[in-house]
């Protein structure tokens, strides 16, 4: 499954939330991998190079904020868009999330009718898919 251009990594330790996000993304035609902590997310991202990483902030072994900071500092992984999906929707949380290395922020509860489109909006063109001469 490496280098699948529609692969999305969902990092969420709440099983029901993880299953819902994966279902919505798969229903929209995406391949999805899931894991439940930031350390696994870093390992999977390095191996699979997903198109987008969707990550909760509060995770067991390593928080989403810590994982995003590590991903943002890694030259081979920093270009992968990272989207925080979290129940933290207080004033200032969005700025804190973006400063930690996330590219976007979606507050929980997610809106099922628009979730997949919100995530796809973070897709960036894959350089190796462009035509010669572009």
Predicted region positions:
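Short amphipathic alpha-helix used as the core "switch/output" element in two-component signaling
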Residues: 43, 65-78
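Charged docking surfaces used in two-component/phosphorelay signaling
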Residues: 19-27
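Short hydrophobic/Thr-rich beta-strand motif most characteristic of the beta2 strand and flanking loop
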Residues: 29-36, 44, 106
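Conserved acidic carboxylate
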Residues: 12
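Active-site beta3 strand of CheY-like receiver
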Residues: 48-54, 59
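Acidic catalytic/metal-coordinating carboxylates
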Residues: 16, 37-40, 63-69
């Amino acid at each position: 499954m490496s280098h699948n251009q529609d692969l999305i990594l969902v990092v969420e330790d709440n099983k029901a939330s993880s299953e819902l996000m994966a279902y919505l993304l798969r229903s929209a035609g995406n391949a999805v991998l899931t894991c439940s902590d930031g350390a696994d997310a870093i390992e999977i991202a390095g191996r699979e190079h997903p198109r987008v990483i969707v990550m909760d902030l509060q995770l067991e072994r390593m928080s989403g904020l810590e994982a995003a900071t590590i991903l943002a500092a890694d030259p081979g992984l920093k270009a992968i868009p990272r989207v925080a999906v979290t129940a933290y929707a207080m004033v200032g949380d969005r700025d804190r999330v973006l400063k930690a290395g996330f590219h976007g922020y979606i507050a929980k509860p997610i809106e099922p009718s628009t979730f997949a489109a919100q995530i796809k909006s973070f897709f960036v063109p894959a350089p190796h898919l462009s035509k010669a001469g572009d």
